[in-house]
Amino acid sequence: MKDVNILVEALPYIKKFHEKKILIKYGGHAMIDEDAMSSTVRDTVLLKYVGMEPLIVHGGGPEISRSMDKLGKEPKFIKGLRVTDEETMEIIEMVLVGKISTDIVSQISYHDGKGISLSGKDSRLIFAHKKPVSKVTSESGGEEEIDLGLVGEIDCINTDLLEMFLKNNYIPVISPVGIADDGSSLNLNADTAAGEIASSVDAEKLIILTDVPGVLRDPNDPDSLIQRIKIDEVPDLIEEGVISGGMIPKIETCVKAIEDGVKSCHIIDGRKKHSLLLEIFTKNGIGTMIYK
């Protein structure tokens, strides 16, 4: 009887999100657990079979750093952003496009779905420009220039390409690599790419799978989860330090996506099995929802 009740509870959400686009951002830190990854991919295929249109944008930071270590290349970061020279860019593409994306597509096929691996360079899916050199105040009080190298800022998304694959029942799996005007590759922030794609395709939801339960009022207390945040509450939560560190850019991505038309954004723990289904098909969901 319990299983029947679960199915009955899911029905309104299956109807509500039928033929709606769901953008799933799968973070690199959430991919470390292979069982959870397999579960997430299987659940994504299920979304497709019940009539939704899921798209995946994946990260891969930990895997990129491990590959760089193996190749004797020291990862460098400035304010949390990876400094990207030409050699680093080659490694990033090798890991994101050549390994992670194809692994996800293989998992989709294993679960009887149709996946397609896409880089932002394919048919200029993600057109971008190099992030300008910026000036910041140094520790000594003077100005210093920061050049992140081949790091990009997104200009536009080729939605026609994505719509073509969605109409043919594919699940697009997108690596956050952009293409510049001269054809060169640019390293993109995966959260930002996910937000831009979500708003460009008029996604109903943007779901960010990461390695924390959501936004916690006390980072040491998992029971302090904030379940719902309105976008106009975000500045105060940042000022109070409730939203801090790596959570800030994720929340900022969510705020921009909602301002650009996405109905709601969700930050959930991708390490938890079936977290995707729990978020979409249950009344209370899990994690933190950001909305207007």
UniProtKB/Swiss-Prot annotation:
Upper lineage: Archaea, Methanobacteriati, Methanobacteriota, Methanomada group, Methanobacteria
Listed NCBIfam families: argB (TIGR00761)
One Pfam family this sequence matches: AA_kinase
UniProt record similarity statement: Belongs to the acetylglutamate kinase family. ArgB subfamily.
Annotated compartments: Cytoplasm
InterPro entries, alphabetized: AceGlu_kinase-like_sf, AcgluKinase_fam, ArgB, Asp/Glu/Uridylate_kinase, NAGK-C
Site note Transition state stabilizer, residues: K25, K250
Any one cellular-component term (Gene Ontology): cytoplasm
Record EC number: 2.7.2.8
Main function: Catalyzes the ATP-dependent phosphorylation of N-acetyl-L-glutamate.
Record-level Gene Ontology MF annotations: acetylglutamate kinase activity; ATP binding
UniProt key word Nucleotide-binding: yes
GO biological process: one example: L-arginine biosynthetic process
Protein name: Acetylglutamate kinase
Main localisation: cytoplasm
Enzyme class: transferase
Reactions it catalyzes: N-acetyl-L-glutamate + ATP = N-acetyl-L-glutamyl 5-phosphate + ADP
Alphabetic keyword roster: Amino-acid biosynthesis, Arginine biosynthesis, ATP-binding, Cytoplasm, Kinase, Nucleotide-binding, Transferase
The keyword Transferase is assigned to this record: yes
Binding annotation for substrate: G60, G61, R82, N187
